[in-house]
């Protein structure tokens, strides 16, 4: 009987933990809760040069502001060894949970997973000059995240066809933290 109660408690705990995660493609997703300060933790792509040093997609998020039908984003990027700011506005598309933004081509993205308080996992498709690549981004509310969340991100990236060699942990890289206001 005690084992049955223990298993029931464990099952309910797993249901509660699972319920806290959300995706922008789900009806229960609350975009307002992603508003605020974020840090780029990891990047993954099927075109590695895009996220290596001096790569155009090696950008470091500072914040996401939720607007009526769009997201205002502030990033930092290192150009000529100096941190520069980039401000972008991503507009909702007609597809549920999808946003589009122009930066180094045409991009559409969705938030695959978030618990709102700790992390966001984003999947982006970039199209430029007839070529397409995908980018996965892991943002955290703090400058670093647990190894469990990082592993969950790596597994999600692999599910999207990105090999481990193309997943970069940026927590020890220059992320322009000194440029944040």
From Swiss-Prot:
Signal sequence, start to end: 1-19
Swiss-Prot/TrEMBL keywords: Disulfide bond, Pheromone, Pheromone-binding, Secreted, Signal
Stored Pfam families: Lipocalin
InterPro entries named in the record: Calycin, Lipocalin, Lipocalin_CS, Lipocln_cytosolic_FA-bd_dom, Maj_urinary
GO CC, one annotated term: extracellular region
Family listed: Belongs to the calycin superfamily. Lipocalin family.
GO MF entries: mating pheromone activity; pheromone binding; small molecule binding
Tissue specificity remark: Detected in urine of males but absent from female urine (at protein level).
Matches recorded under PROSITE patterns: LIPOCALIN (PS00213)
Record-given protein name: Major urinary protein 20
Subcellular location field: Secreted
Xref: CDD domains: lipocalin_MUP-like (cd19428)
Main function: Male pheromone which stimulates female sexual attraction to male urinary scent and promotes a strong learned attraction to the airborne urinary odor of an individual male. Promotes spatial learning by rapidly conditioning preference for its remembered location among females and competitor males so that animals prefer to spend time in the site even when scent is absent. In addition to promoting a rapid attraction response, also elicits ultrasonic vocalizations and urinary scent marking in females which do not occur immediately after exposure.
Origin: domain of life: Eukaryota
Gene Ontology BP terms: olfactory learning; positive regulation of neural precursor cell proliferation; positive regulation of neurogenesis; vocalization behavior
Disulfide bonds: 83-176
């Amino acid at each position: 009987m005690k084992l049955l109660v223990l298993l029931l408690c464990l099952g309910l705990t797993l249901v509660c933990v699972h319920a806290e995660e959300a995706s922008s493609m789900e009806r229960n997703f609350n975009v307002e809760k992603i508003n605020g300060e974020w840090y780029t933790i990891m990047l993954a792509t099927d075109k590695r040069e895009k996220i290596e040093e001096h790569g155009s997609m090696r950008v470091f998020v500072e914040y996401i502001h939720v607007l009526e039908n769009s997201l205002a984003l502030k990033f930092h990027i290192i150009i000529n060894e100096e941190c520069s700011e980039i401000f972008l506005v991503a507009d909702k598309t007609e597809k549920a949970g999808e946003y589009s933004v122009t930066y180094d081509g045409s991009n559409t993205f969705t938030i695959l997973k978030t618990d709102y308080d700790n992390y966001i996992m984003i999947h982006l498709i970039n199209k430029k000059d007839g070529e397409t690549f995908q980018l996965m981004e892991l943002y955290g509310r703090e400058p670093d995240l647990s190894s469990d969340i990082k592993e969950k991100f790596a597994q999600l990236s692999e599910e999207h066809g990105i090999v481990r060699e193309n997943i970069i942990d940026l927590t020890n890289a220059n992320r322009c933290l000194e440029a944040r206001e």
